[in-house]
């Protein structure tokens, strides 16, 4: 039942071989580009017709591609397991192709689907199959199927962490933005809720209920469900929040100093007022120093924020209670300032900001109501104040919410990028470990370098062959394995081989031997590869001794009489891989052939060596004559003198003891346990439980429970730990200085700036809506406080209609399906263009600003001082507030009738124009997509325009208001007497107005700079994380594609799975598999080692071309059900029906496909003979039946198939006739039923099977 032993020396006729079960190889783009590299956003193809390709039409590698190759090369990860990592000199990027044939050759013989004139399409990989039990009979379809468990590999990814924010996935525009290079962030809602800012992309229809829920979500404090993630988020933005807090403290100090200056400018001074403000300045300065110390921790941030809120509240109370003269409009500007800065610059959650804003507003209103209760006009002032504070709080919410959502989304996306990168890195490390366990490092390195480098046109495929002199080759065969296999089920057979060869792999590593291949029950390895060793013969002899000891333990545990027959020869080898598909590292040379016959002519339990090997041993072992020629015709024919090892000498024993002691000391000094090399399920069927026997522990196997403990790592904790380290290492100042210009805040690299400018802000419609809401509040304020006029109503109505239109068009972008295509197109042009959206934003802000002051021109502009001077017949400079009180005319704040003969109404509260302008400045800050420089220019324009109006044409409005406020205070304090008491005066409004507007412009600019700086740094970090993730995914894709050319995809997925049970083995029972062996019968006559042909390398080059042609044929779409198993010397092995996707139980198409492939190989060999002037003869054998497929070698896996079907197929090849295809009776019945042309050969004597009736396949079904 075991697969027959085959060897790789040229000309050796393989009897049977093991076989992988699933397709691999360099598939066409749809198999590898899209399936394996979809995460990168573009497929990888050999020629690079993919969307993201940087390859020029002529095939030249662009500088960008070379740079990408260098980046990828630097990211080639190492591995500290059984193989060292590939070096960083390995270039990894660009197109991927395993064939380096010239263009003319490709056009003639077919190639990839990469724009080179291909006639053949690469077929996709056949997936891993489910288990099919073999029937009891020998053929296909006979008998009942026995149940068997399939151990298919599944790819395990870290679960997605619910961060409490839902990503916005814009379907209609996402592809365009990705193609434009935009790195687009989404939004979401906190606490696992739905998105609060319309998390629906274009094409979504927003219901009224959803809008209401989204509106309510805005006022909820955002926090990640996991406290650990929340703390990580706070660490992520800690430095930025620290900078924002410092900035807020600076502007608060400025505001307090301005308030002190205003108070000190007009005596009498209020000492409590001065003391409180001075104390507030001192406290804030001390806090600023403490917050910028190295000891300041993120846990201190909350305390600092709430302490600052307490200071602001104290300033608010004192600032409203103590100053004189009192007015309900006093302190509005700093209250608005405090409210807005708490929302925007103070790093607190929404709930705390809202509570602080409401508390400040309530304090102002309560104090104004208490201290100004006697004012007849108090009601409209309070109403106006409520409107102003409400507007400020709403604008603060509209600014705070998208900023925090953007920050949290940036954190989420960065974490997801890091999570994906770490997952890709883990997979990549596993792939590299698996890759390096199958191919030696130097071979894999050379292949990857050639894959990613531009290849010159060559007439032949590149051959990966290296010549090594002075090596020792060991062949070992398990004698008695057939009797052992006959007592095992399919699963037990795989487990037994897995356990035994895993132990052999460990012994090979310990003895400095490189395992080459496992062929059935034959194991062979070489010492002196890839690095030369002077003691290569000693290593092989020690390896043989350890193998004999290991098999004795197996004999002891299983009770089956098994033993090892070991043959060793020293000489020269050619090592490498042949063909284009299913690469397996192998060695070729006449010395390899001799080593194989040394094993065949050896004795059980003994090490059989040649004279050449004995010469390298330097007398360290006692030997006796081997007489190998008596047991093997090849040794006799070539007069090979052989010896059998008896024992090592005393001197050698002492050397071994010394070496073992040094190894133990080195291991202890390193401080870690040696790597686990045991099989995945050590002799489980014999032990009957989870315990590992004493004998198995002696063989080096570990307890599965220990292995479970080693592998129990949490991917989420790894992601958080990595992100935490990255946050700690991130330098905000360094990132700013390296990538961002200091004042303009633009990226120094034009490409980065271009990518950033192409970002689309989905919230633009919300910005316009918020600015329009500010307009409505300004309208309400002015309608309440300013005398009405037809101009006011008509102007507001016109502005309202314009803003409604702008809001409507902007909001269409979020609900595109509801509106006609022209409106959709217009909305997209506005929102998706930064210039267009900025222009619309400026237009909206301009309308809001005009609505804030335009009514000034409808007010009475007569100078009250002139009127009073004329009335009292005094000079203007002598007029004061007492003259207003003593005037016969009703000059008061409550009188809106014109005076001094002017019919226009009086605007007695012009400071509300200033407050309206402040609201328009806040509306400017809402538009986060406008750059900070753009906002600064716009705000300066607003300030300059308004200040000019205040200081020149409408200055009398403010002078009159100052006079009337003082007169109102005198009138109230006089209690109706005729006396005019001493009174306090205020700083003139025409002086205060430019100062407070300048303070607001400065604060809003600092906030805009902070917002844009944060957004750009988030973009930069996320872009770097995304690029690293994509580079790792590209590297992973290249490794996966290379790996899939060595192992079937389902096998690779099984061994790459992160969470795999220790008792899980990979095996399948396949009920009807067609197996083919095709050998070049006379290749051994062609192969000679001469100096003229580079010691046989040129012979191997031709063999490589032949195998490459066969690989190209099997890649054709019509042969997609076929799977190349491997090559053994000059024998090509393939099978079909190994999994559900290739097995056709009813139509038997997989059997017919293998027969067609065999005939195609015959035709191809004739074509090769014509063009190479050779006379190669092929023998092909076919058989069908059940097989067992599985993986042996836990750390150096090799996919194999075993069974009588494989043995008989090999015999059909070895007993065949040159240039004929020999098939069994089972195969004949299927092909004859499908009208294939066959002839009976007759009865053939087959070794181990007796006499068998066989047939020749002459041709396919006749054409109808």
UniProtKB/Swiss-Prot annotation:
<dbReference type="InterPro" id="IPR001054">
    <property type="entry name" value="A/G_cyclase"/>
</dbReference>
<feature type="binding site">
    <location>
        <position position="477"/>
    </location>
    <ligand>
        <name>Mg(2+) 2</name>
    </ligand>
</feature>
<dbReference type="GO" id="GO:0007204">
    <property type="term" value="P:positive regulation of cytosolic calcium ion concentration"/>
</dbReference>
<feature type="topological domain" description="Extracellular">
    <location>
        <begin position="860"/>
        <end position="912"/>
    </location>
</feature>
<feature type="transmembrane region" description="Helical">
    <location>
        <begin position="301"/>
        <end position="322"/>
    </location>
</feature>
<dbReference type="InterPro" id="IPR030672">
    <property type="entry name" value="Adcy"/>
</dbReference>
<keyword id="KW-0969">Cilium</keyword>
<comment type="function">
    <text>Catalyzes the formation of the signaling molecule cAMP in response to G-protein signaling. Mediates signaling downstream of ADRB1. Regulates the increase of free cytosolic Ca(2+) in response to increased blood glucose levels and contributes to the regulation of Ca(2+)-dependent insulin secretion.</text>
</comment>
<feature type="modified residue" description="Phosphoserine">
    <location>
        <position position="757"/>
    </location>
</feature>
<keyword id="KW-0479">Metal-binding</keyword>
<feature type="binding site">
    <location>
        <begin position="1207"/>
        <end position="1211"/>
    </location>
    <ligand>
        <name>ATP</name>
    </ligand>
</feature>
<dbReference type="GO" id="GO:0007189">
    <property type="term" value="P:adenylate cyclase-activating G protein-coupled receptor signaling pathway"/>
</dbReference>
<comment type="subunit">
    <text>Interacts with GNAS, GNB1 and GNG2. Part of a complex containing AKAP5, ADCY6, PDE4C and PKD2. Interacts with RAF1.</text>
</comment>
<keyword id="KW-0472">Membrane</keyword>
<feature type="region of interest" description="Disordered">
    <location>
        <begin position="1"/>
        <end position="198"/>
    </location>
</feature>
<feature type="glycosylation site" description="N-linked (GlcNAc...) asparagine">
    <location>
        <position position="975"/>
    </location>
</feature>
<keyword id="KW-0488">Methylation</keyword>
<feature type="modified residue" description="Phosphoserine">
    <location>
        <position position="99"/>
    </location>
</feature>
<feature type="domain" description="Guanylate cyclase 1">
    <location>
        <begin position="472"/>
        <end position="599"/>
    </location>
</feature>
<keyword id="KW-0547">Nucleotide-binding</keyword>
<protein>
    <recommendedName>
        <fullName>Adenylate cyclase type 5</fullName>
        <ecNumber>4.6.1.1</ecNumber>
    </recommendedName>
</protein>
<dbReference type="InterPro" id="IPR009398">
    <property type="entry name" value="Adcy_conserved_dom"/>
</dbReference>
<dbReference type="Pfam" id="PF06327">
    <property type="entry name" value="Adcy_cons_dom"/>
</dbReference>
<feature type="domain" description="Guanylate cyclase 2">
    <location>
        <begin position="1074"/>
        <end position="1213"/>
    </location>
</feature>
<dbReference type="GO" id="GO:0046872">
    <property type="term" value="F:metal ion binding"/>
</dbReference>
<keyword id="KW-1003">Cell membrane</keyword>
<feature type="transmembrane region" description="Helical">
    <location>
        <begin position="987"/>
        <end position="1006"/>
    </location>
</feature>
<comment type="similarity">
    <text>Belongs to the adenylyl cyclase class-4/guanylyl cyclase family.</text>
</comment>
<feature type="binding site">
    <location>
        <begin position="519"/>
        <end position="521"/>
    </location>
    <ligand>
        <name>ATP</name>
    </ligand>
</feature>
<feature type="glycosylation site" description="N-linked (GlcNAc...) asparagine">
    <location>
        <position position="873"/>
    </location>
</feature>
<feature type="compositionally biased region" description="Gly residues">
    <location>
        <begin position="125"/>
        <end position="144"/>
    </location>
</feature>
<dbReference type="GO" id="GO:0006171">
    <property type="term" value="P:cAMP biosynthetic process"/>
</dbReference>
<dbReference type="GO" id="GO:0005886">
    <property type="term" value="C:plasma membrane"/>
</dbReference>
<feature type="modified residue" description="Phosphoserine">
    <location>
        <position position="160"/>
    </location>
</feature>
<feature type="topological domain" description="Cytoplasmic">
    <location>
        <begin position="399"/>
        <end position="765"/>
    </location>
</feature>
<feature type="binding site">
    <location>
        <position position="1126"/>
    </location>
    <ligand>
        <name>ATP</name>
    </ligand>
</feature>
<feature type="binding site">
    <location>
        <position position="478"/>
    </location>
    <ligand>
        <name>Mg(2+) 2</name>
    </ligand>
</feature>
<keyword id="KW-0966">Cell projection</keyword>
<feature type="transmembrane region" description="Helical">
    <location>
        <begin position="938"/>
        <end position="958"/>
    </location>
</feature>
<feature type="modified residue" description="Phosphoserine">
    <location>
        <position position="669"/>
    </location>
</feature>
<feature type="topological domain" description="Cytoplasmic">
    <location>
        <begin position="1007"/>
        <end position="1264"/>
    </location>
</feature>
<dbReference type="GO" id="GO:0005929">
    <property type="term" value="C:cilium"/>
</dbReference>
